[in-house]
Amino acid sequence: MQTLLELGNVVAQKRRALGLKQGEVANRAGIPQATLSRFELGKTAEFGSRKLLAVLSVLGLEIDYVLTNSAGSLD
């Protein structure tokens, strides 16, 4: 199981690889940009499953991929 910091890193790397800004992803996922920022930086104690699934959907990622791959292997 990955930590929130590791999950946040995966999300940030994928977002950057797609050339998307935090505000764009957050808006499409229906969450505040500040919430996504805190998640990507590992500065949140919790990030609900609905939020996570919404963000992953925007980025074209699936939960099983994120949970079984390390943050360094997004290619």
What are these regions (language model features)?
Residues L20-S37:
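Short alpha-helical DNA-recognition segment
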Residues R16, N27, S57:
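Short polybasic/polar patches that bind polyanions
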Residues A45, D64-D75:
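Short, charged recognition helix plus adjacent turn
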